[in-house]
Swiss-Prot record:
Highest rank taxon of the organism: Bacteria
Signal peptide: none
Lineage: Bacteria, Pseudomonadati, Pseudomonadota, Gammaproteobacteria, Enterobacterales
Alphabetized GO MF terms: agmatinase activity; manganese ion binding
EC number from the UniProt entry: 3.5.3.11
Primary gene name: speB
Catalysed reaction equations from the record: agmatine + H2O = urea + putrescine
Pfam families referenced in this protein's UniProt entry, alphabetically: Arginase (PF00491)
Protein task: Catalyzes the formation of putrescine from agmatine.
InterPro entries: Agmatinase, Agmatinase-rel, Ureohydrolase, Ureohydrolase_dom_sf, Ureohydrolase_Mn_BS
UniProt-recorded name of the protein: Agmatinase
Cofactor annotation: Mn(2+)
Pathway: Amine and polyamine biosynthesis; putrescine biosynthesis via agmatine pathway; putrescine from agmatine: step 1/1
Length: 306
């Protein structure tokens, strides 16, 4: 089985078109793309409500509502004129085999990065970030992590495949440096001695966006950054369609402003995870995820215009 393939390989969970109706390219390694979008339809590491495997399809589906705006407000330029972005479809793996998914995703990412591409990935549950971090660390070395979430995902339970343990495992493997990493929007219990800077939801909601961004920049410094956004960072009023919703989160407006504020960081990889459309209302969670993903691409495109 190939790592990537035609859409019929994952016909139960895949689309026939790309994010923002961007070109589909099932062999992106030799393409001239700057950024490659990969869907990872996986939710076997979920502890709460399952259904994240349908997240990539939902994000792509609702992104058609964003494709019409060329000079996007407030950027006032067309990202597609500055970045060559392709969608390579979904990772193909034997459903039910978490280890195969992890190994194939890491291999796919390593091949893309070796070819000079950058990755924007759609989960799937948050475990998919760990094989992506492994691939990125091989290419870029130890990185800083900027992590939006309701949970720190630093829990040590001894389980190999768990969407709540990646950021316990990643520092131990030398993939990320907790002392230069920040977790934003947290509002569940966590270990305060793991080295990460935690900006909990109360702090982030009560402080100005500029103040939060200034602290993030100070923590990260000039390190290569991996940006991961768990959609449950948003309050369930804005993102009900997720496996482990927690009230008291960020508004979609504040989240977008925070992502825009990361423009000056050296971001080398990005993902949006944990969209579970079965629990969504009027596709608002998928729309939030698609919009945040688009903003992530815009902060990359903005650098090319400077």
């Amino acid at each position: 089985m190939s790592t990537l393939g035609h859409q019929y390989d994952n016909s139960l969970v895949s689309n026939a078109f790309g994010f923002l109706r961007l070109p589909m390219n099932f062999q992106p390694y030799d393409s001239d793309a700057d950024w490659v979008i990969t869907g990872v339809p996986f939710d076997m590491a979920t502890s709460g409500r399952a259904g994240g495997r349908h997240g990539p399809a939902a994000i792509r589906q609702v992104s058609t509502n964003l494709a019409w705006e060329h000079n996007r407000f407030p950027w006032n330029f067309d990202m597609r004129e500055r970045l060559n972005v392709v969608d390579c479809g979904d990772l193909v793996y034997a459903f039910g085999d978490a280890r195969e998914m992890s190994e194939k995703l890491q291999a796919h990412a390593e091949k893309l990065l070796a070819a000079g591409k950058r990755m924007l990935s759609f989960g799937g549950d948050h475990f998919v970030t760990l094989p992506l971090l492994r691939a990125h660390a091989k290419h870029f070395g130890k990185m800083a992590l900027v992590h939006f979430d309701a949970h720190t995902d630093t829990y040590a339970n001894g389980c190999e495949f768990d969407h709540g343990t990646m950021f316990y495992t990643a520092p131990k493997e030398g993939l990320i440096d907790p002392n230069h990493s920040v977790q934003i929007g947290i509002r569940t219990e966590f270990d305060k001695d793991n080295g990460f800077t935690v900006l909990d939801a109360c702090q982030v909601n009560d402080r100005s966006v500029d103040d939060v961004i200034a602290q993030v920049k100070q923590i990260v410094g000039d390190m290569s950054v991996y940006l991961t956004f768990d959609i449950d960072c948003l309050d369930p009023a804005f993102a009900p369609g997720t496996g482990t919703p927690v009230i008291g989160g960020l508004t979609s407006d504040r989240a977008i402003k925070l992502v825009r504020g990361l423009k000056d960081l050296n971001i080398v990889g990005m993902d949006v995870v944990e969209v579970a459309p079965a629990y969504d209302q009027s596709e608002i969670t998928a729309l939030a995820a698609a919009t945040l993903a688009l903003e992530m691409l815009y902060i990359q495109a903005a650098k090319k215009g400077e």
